[in-house]
């Protein structure tokens, strides 16, 4: 089983879907023992490889999920600089996933994801679901007890979503059911200041 190390920034505006595709095809760097290197011969070849990686994950729905134009835009976007380096001369992408204290001074926030988690998020292809799950996962780890509790508004505010749009809260409620059914999280109830709240744990 591969583990994926991902920097966690709550209000990032990166598109996680494309980042996860790059993680899926990365090969190991023997010096760090991390899957952080993507080499390619041309953007056409890399585009094809990313689409194959997605279709191998989502076998019931073969399609093109990224075009050469979109890939070029993703690779050249400054907003992705926290997550990978792109060298278009040597045709190599290096994922920034080395979070040892020596590299970061122990200050970087990061999450470790499994193949199963990455595949689940790729198949559902929802940025809101991805950000919601990463939020739960990060704060379960941060607590040191594998549990966290928060309100929908707390998550939405931290992730720069509108707290006034009722459809977001409806979606989050449906995501709770989905994540529980997929055995990725458990949810228990407790009362706080007279109100019932959810407590989340990662399985």
Spell out what each predicted region is.
Residues 21-23:
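Cysteine-centered metal-binding/redox modules
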Residues 1-16, 27-35, 98-124:
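Positively charged, structured surface patches that bind polyanionic biopolymers
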Residues 2, 14-18, 43, 68, ...:
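Short amphipathic alpha-helical segments that mediate assembly, nucleic-acid/protein binding
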Residues 26-93, 141-199:
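Winged helix-turn-helix DNA-binding recognition segment
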Residues 9-17, 122-131, 135, 139, ...:
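Short helix-coil-helix linker/hinge
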Residues 1-8, 105, 110-111, 183-203:
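Long, low-complexity, charge-rich intrinsically disordered regions
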């Amino acid at each position: 089983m591969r583990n994926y190390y991902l920097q966690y920034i709550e209000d990032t505006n990166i598109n996680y879907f494309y980042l996860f595709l790059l993680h899926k095809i990365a090969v190991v760097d023997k010096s760090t023992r991390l899957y952080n290197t993507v080499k390619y011969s041309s953007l056409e070849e890399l585009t094809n490889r990313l689409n194959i990686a997605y279709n191998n994950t989502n076998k019931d729905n073969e399609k093109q999920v990224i075009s050469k134009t979109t890939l070029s835009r993703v690779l050249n976007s400054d907003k992705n600089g926290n997550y990978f380096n792109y060298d278009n001369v040597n045709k190599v992408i290096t994922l920034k996933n080395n979070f040892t204290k020596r590299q970061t001074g122990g200050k970087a926030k990061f999450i470790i994801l499994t193949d199963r988690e990455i595949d689940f998020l790729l198949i559902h292809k929802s940025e809101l679901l991805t950000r919601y799950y990463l939020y739960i996962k990060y704060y379960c780890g941060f607590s040191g007890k594998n549990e966290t509790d928060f309100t929908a508004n707390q998550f939405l505010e931290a992730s720069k979503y509108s707290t006034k749009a009722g459809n977001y809260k409806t979606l989050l409620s449906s995501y709770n059911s989905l994540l529980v059914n997929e055995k990725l999280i458990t949810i228990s109830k407790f009362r706080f200041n007279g109100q019932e709240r959810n407590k989340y744990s990662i399985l």
